[in-house]
Amino acid sequence: MQTFLPFKQFDKSAQALDNKRLNKQILESYQILKVLSNDDPKAAWRNHPAVKMWRGFEGQLWLYTMAMVKEADVRGIKTDKNMENLTNLKAVAGDDWGYSIPNWYKNPFALQRLTTTHKANLYTKDPIYYFEFYDSLATSNPCCPERKEPCKYYWVAHDPKFASNVKVAA
């Protein structure tokens, strides 16, 4: 599960993704929004770092998702079923979503680490399509190098500098 942010701007991130990942971002964003809109503390994926980073900032994730949908529409990728699900979810839960900008997004160091690791991982997924992200491999700085299996991404929810700013589930 991931929300790819190879660039700070949501629309630029959407434009950078290949069709497969672009379409998947719409689905994964919906899944994250659904988890965040569910009060069940045992809900699947509730503690995944991709979910935690958007907790309390669901409105920003909605804007990210809409940037993905807009780009998919430009490319002629069908989004009608996804939009139906998203619209229904927003109608039910949108009033409870937080719309402020996440602290990690406002921090240039955190955002640079996040976008660089996303570029590096996109490159490894499809080196031909993402050839322009090659340089990110050398400067990628994921978190948790001490883990048995280190993270491939920089997760703001794992970073002590930002973990306290990531809202926790009630």
Segments the model singles out, each with a brief description of its role:
Residues 1-166:
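Expand to "…catalyze enediolate/carbanion chemistry for C-C bond making/breaking, isomerization
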